[in-house]
Amino acid sequence: MKFLILNCLILFSLISSEATNVKLDREDQNHLVLLNEKNFEKLTQASTGATTGTWFVKFYAPWCSHCRKMAPAWESLAKALKGQVNVADVDVTRNLNLGKRFQIRGYPTLLLFHKGKMYQYEGGERTVEKLSEFALGDFKNAVGAPVPQPLSLFALVSDFVVSGVNEALRVYDAALAGFVTISSFSFLFGLLVGLMLSLFLFTRRATRKPKVLTERKKDK
């Protein structure tokens, strides 16, 4: 009985140790921070104090080929800057409000947040070396902009209403254009059919008159 209990304890210790090692390995491999609408401000404190350090954030879309191309360099950058600069990702297609807040117009957009200001990386090369130089000091040569506040409930509702109105107008314009096109086609088609029918009747009458005259001459 004691032997069985001892074996169980040893087995449990081995499993716990293995699970801990796997967890540590995964944490060590995962250097990128995944940000979303729920945790962005809490983790970055971009507009509320910036006590969590400097953040270098990539705003991307899954379908963007340039984003996929630079992914290995971005992951290497996160590993190289660990403990100095927080490197993170934001999938804008799943976090539309963050895209609106920071006015993301293209992918990838790289923004560095430092002490209440944000700096956009506009360098042509997206190598680990160039990105690292920017994150560790070269960003100061760029023009910084104040970090916009999180979108308020009023702003979200207003944007929803405006988007709804714009979509309704787009549908109306498309429907109106379709109606005009179909109406014009129907009118022209009807006109063409009418002309063909009139021509057919006129031709038929013209061919029947001589026959009637011929029959009358025979009667005389």
UniProtKB/Swiss-Prot annotation:
Checking CDD domains in the record gives: PDI_a_family (cd02961)
**What cellular component GO annotations does this protein have?**
endoplasmic reticulum lumen; endoplasmic reticulum membrane
Name the residue ranges of motif: Di-lysine motif. Answer: 217-220
Q: Which residues form the signal peptide?
A: 1-19
Q: Which residues lie on this side of the membrane: Cytoplasmic?
A: 203-220
Q: Which residues form the Thioredoxin domain?
A: 20-141
What kind of membrane protein is this, topologically? Single-pass type I membrane protein
Which PANTHER family does the annotation name? PROTEIN DISULFIDE-ISOMERASE A6 (PTHR45815:SF3)
Could you tell me what this protein is called?
A: Thioredoxin domain-containing protein
Q: Which organism is it from?
A: Theileria parva (East coast fever infection agent)
